[in-house]
Amino acid sequence: MFKFNDEKGQLKCSFCGKTQDQVRKLVAGPGVYICDECIELCTEIVEEELGNEEEFEFKDVPKPVEIREILDEYVIGQDEAKKSLAVAVYNHYKRINSGSKIDDVELSKSNILMIGPTGSGKTLLAQTLARILNVPFAIADATSLTEAGYVGEDVENILLKLIQAADYDVERAEKGIIYIDEIDKIARKSENPSITRDVSGEGVQQALLKILEGTIASVPPQGGRKHPHQEFIQIDTTNILFICGGAFDGIEPIIKRRLGKKVIGFGAEMNQADVDEKNLLSKVLPEDLLKFGLIPEFIGRLPVITTLEPLDEQALIDILTKPKNAIVKQYKKMLELDGVELEFEEAALREIAKKAIERKTGARGLRSIIEGIMLDVMFELPSREDVQKCIITVDTVCGKKPPKLIRHDGTVVEHERKTSA
């Protein structure tokens, strides 16, 4: 099956159709030709497959101290949470390496429950763990899940996201990490079991039990609801690490009540309550989660419970400037590529942190605040070859004055208009 060009009688690659003049080398086989470009492409595909196989042997799982050190590069504060996560993740993958049984001792899964306010770093911690271990990672929102047979997503769709993250390599997906956000939203609506169906609360908790513990799940490859005439992807969830996170708004009074403090009324220990308010979440116990609305079986599948603290002003400033992927560093690098030096005054950073605290969005709100400040700067400066430096002041953050622009000769650019708040 020789391939010839009809016009010049030249040999062609049997795979891509390029002629011998269009490639550097054409290798002949029995009845076929292959060019150097196709050989290179095939080699890359094979190497990628072999690389993936080696990648998931987990022979060199980082030690807890090493995991914590890498987390410190990306996540500010939350020292106790980092320590708990590092130990839990290390034990989980050590269990996988050992085959989950050592001398007739069965090692159980160490799924994790993270409790902390919005924007405290729950999702970022889970994402960073997956990056450290180089495993497939998927995020699911518990609020979109419903019990099988009702409008909404089946719990198996969570597993589909992980399979997709692993490029449909089921073996890789079986050693991945799934982060389920807003897990507190599937709490039972009442402490007492209801007569009516709670399809997005207790029903979802019941549906999640099996996959959290470890089962062979049947996942519809295209997502959506199952129907009898479709093929399923079979995946074993035994070695998938599940990390669940939620704000658990309203659990503090439950913890206070257990600790014997009065929630309201005369004679309440106000001073003591104020002192302990910040550390209240760290005292959470499984019995508090039970009263909040999680069922006992579900709590039992999440043996590692860790709490995150609300971020204070200084922590938010550190988040803006210190991590490897800090947003201020990113903007500095982007403007540096245009030949402009970017500087944020200390007072400006403090004002940004205050705004995030006022909005009660934690670290998540920092990006939207900075993007609002930087929009005009990023729009105009690439066209301004005369500007050497841009300084963001506290007045810029408050919307009173535009950023201070300095020319190459050291003179300040005079602005005729104000930027929007």
Curated annotation (Swiss-Prot):
InterPro entries with a match to the protein in the record: AAA+_ATPase, ATP-dep_Clp_protease_ClpX, ATPase_AAA_core, Clp_ATPase_C, Clp_protease_ATP-bd_su_ClpX, ClpX_bact, P-loop_NTPase, Znf_CppX_C4
GO molecular function, one term: unfolded protein binding
Residues covered by the ClpX-type ZB domain: 1-54
Binding site for Zn(2+): 13, 16, 35, 38
GO-annotated biological processes: cell division; proteolysis involved in protein catabolic process
One GO CC term, this protein: HslUV protease complex
Pfam families from the UniProt entry: AAA_2, ClpB_D2-small, zf-C4_ClpX
Self-association and partners: Component of the ClpX-ClpP complex. Forms a hexameric ring that, in the presence of ATP, binds to fourteen ClpP subunits assembled into a disk-like structure with a central cavity, resembling the structure of eukaryotic proteasomes.
Protein family according to the UniProt entry: Belongs to the ClpX chaperone family.
Function according to Swiss-Prot or TrEMBL: ATP-dependent specificity component of the Clp protease. It directs the protease to specific substrates. Can perform chaperone functions in the absence of ClpP.
Name of the protein this chain belongs to: ATP-dependent Clp protease ATP-binding subunit ClpX
